[in-house]
Regions:
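C-terminal transmembrane module of polytopic alpha-helical membrane proteins
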Residues: 1-21, 86, 116-127, 177-248
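Extracytosolic (periplasmic/ER-lumenal) interhelical loops and adjacent juxtamembrane/interface segments
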Residues: 31-57, 124
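Alpha-helical transmembrane segments of multi-pass membrane proteins
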Residues: 17-33
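Transmembrane helix-loop-helix
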Residues: 52-148, 182-197
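Structural signal for the C-terminal ends of transmembrane alpha-helices
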Residues: 74, 78-79, 147-152, 204-213
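Juxtamembrane/interfacial segments flanking transmembrane helices
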Residues: 29-32, 150-160, 211-220
Length: 248
């Protein structure tokens, strides 16, 4: 099966698997890779510049990694065939960064007031304990793109005996994440709004790819110098370069 996968999809699966295995090996030696490569709140002392990229390749366990990579393997090849490898990789990374940006905003709204009420030592300890890992934002972005580009593809989902259109599936997942984010349970440690961030940035990127050139052309036309147009009665030829000569 791996042989038939396009290159970026295959390499994403391999990299995520290697990172998960590395986290297990390092944990046996007392090193928590998820802490160093996972995403921290931007004001935390353990936040590093590489974390917005590395966090999306780390996972909390086999199940977390398996289901994310299963989704990449299911939907990624169709997108990579449609867009090409370069554009698919850009999309994957941008949606992953979209998850990171939204999660940082959520922390700023929810965590920052708590940190401000604590003494500096306790605030620093709490900030460093909050970590986000996983490729779920990129996966939700991939799901959105598949439903956008192939809306009428029918899919079977576990525990649902009838096929569902890809577009409908995207809407269902988005609503589930939205409601779960608005009314989280006390034991819920899933970054639901961050998942929606992957979808939002995926939507923006797809719209830019589809309509960006048209927008840029219209924007350039606003500032392009206008030339005089002169029309004769017998036709509508554009005489922008017509030269007038005084009679001798």
């Amino acid at each position: 099966m791996m042989r038939n996968l396009p290159p970026i999809t295959k390499n994403l699966l391999i990299i995520n698997l290697i990172c998960w295995l590395a986290s297990i090996v390092f944990e046996r030696y007392g090193v928590d890779l998820n802490h160093y490569l996972g995403l921290h709140y931007i004001t935390a002392s353990d936040f590093y510049f590489w974390q917005p990229f590395t966090y999306m390749f780390m996972h909390a366990g086999f199940t977390h990694m398996f289901f994310n990579m299963f989704a990449v393997m299911m939907f990624g090849p169709a997108l990579e065939e449609h867009w090409g490898s370069k554009r698919f990789l850009i999309y994957y990374l941008i949606t992953g960064l979209g998850e990171e940006i939204v999660q940082e905003c959520v922390w700023a709204l929810q965590l920052q007031p708590v940190l401000a009420s604590l003494d500096p030592v306790m605030a620093s300890k709490l900030a460093n304990r909050v970590v986000t890992i996983g490729a779920s934002g990129a996966v939700f972005g991939i799901l959105l793109a598949f439903g956008w580009l192939f809306p009428d593809v029918r899919m079977f989902i576990m525990f649902i005996p009838i096929p569902i259109r890809a577009r409908t599936l995207v809407i269902i997942y988005a609503l589930i994440e939205l409601f779960a984010g608005l009314a989280p349970s006390s034991s819920d440690n899933v970054a639901h709004f961050a998942h929606l961030g992957g979808m939002i940035f995926g939507c923006i990127l797809i719209l830019w790819w589809q309509y960006g050139d048209r927008f840029k052309n219209k924007w350039r036309d606003l500032f392009r110098p206008r030339h005089p147009r002169i029309k004769r009665d017998d036709d509508s030829v554009d005489y922008r370069d017509y030269h007038y000569h005084e009679p001798l």
